[in-house]
Structure formats: structure tokens, C-alpha cells
């Protein structure tokens, strides 16, 4: 029972780090590395999170700057599921 509590606390800490770092802000995500992580992972530098979310975030970033995914400098590394 204690371990479940610890896991919940750790999960909440990770989620709050994500949102504190504005991981979903397309203005700040730019061209994050596209890796093949199965589950969403958040890091302090906002660089690693779920592949699908990276792709979506990148697409939003590009559409805000008036570009398409084809015009993206980092689309070759994208591998959306």
C-alpha cells in the first residue's frame, strides 16, 4: 500500500514538472527529437515525450509559423504511429 502511494506521488511530480515546463506549448517545443518511446515520458528539457505527442506538437508549431509538415527541417526523423 505504501508503494502505491509513492508511485502516485512520483507520477504527480512528473506530471507537474511537465506542465511547469510547458511541455505542450508549441511555441517552445519546436523540433523535439522524435524517439520511439511507447509511453509518455517527460524530461526537464521538454525533449522527450510520447512519439505521437511530439508529432502533434511539431505539427501545431509549424502551422503557427505558416509551414507544412513537408517543409519541416526535422520531418525526416518523425515516425508517427
UniProtKB/Swiss-Prot annotation:
Ranges annotated as spanning the membrane: none
Molecular function as annotated in GO: toxin activity
Modification after translation (UniProt): Contains 3 disulfide bonds.
Signal peptide: 1-20
Location(s) in or outside the cell: Secreted
Any coiled-coil regions, as ranges: none
GO CC annotations, alphabetized: extracellular region
Superkingdom of origin organism: Eukaryota
Keywords in alphabetical order: Disulfide bond, Secreted, Signal, Toxin
Keyword Zinc-finger listed: no
UniProt note on tissues of expression: Expressed by the venom apparatus.
Matching SUPFAM superfamilies: Kazal-type serine protease inhibitors
CDD domains with a match to the protein in the record: KAZAL_FS
Known function: Probable toxin.
Family per similarity comment: Belongs to the caterpillar 3 family.
Name the record gives this protein: U-megalopygitoxin(3)-Mo4
Amino acid at each position: 500500500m505504501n508503494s502505491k502511494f509513492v508511485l502516485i506521488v512520483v507520477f504527480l511530480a512528473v506530471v507537474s514538472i511537465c506542465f511547469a515546463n510547458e511541455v505542450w506549448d508549441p511555441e517552445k517545443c519546436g523540433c523535439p527529437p522524435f524517439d520511439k518511446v511507447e509511453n509518455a515520458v517527460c524530461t526537464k528539457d521538454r525533449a522527450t515525450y510520447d512519439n505521437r505527442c511530439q508529432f502533434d506538437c511539431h505539427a501545431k508549431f509549424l502551422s503557427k509559423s505558416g509551414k507544412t509538415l513537408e517543409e519541416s527541417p526535422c520531418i525526416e526523423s518523425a515516425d508517427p504511429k
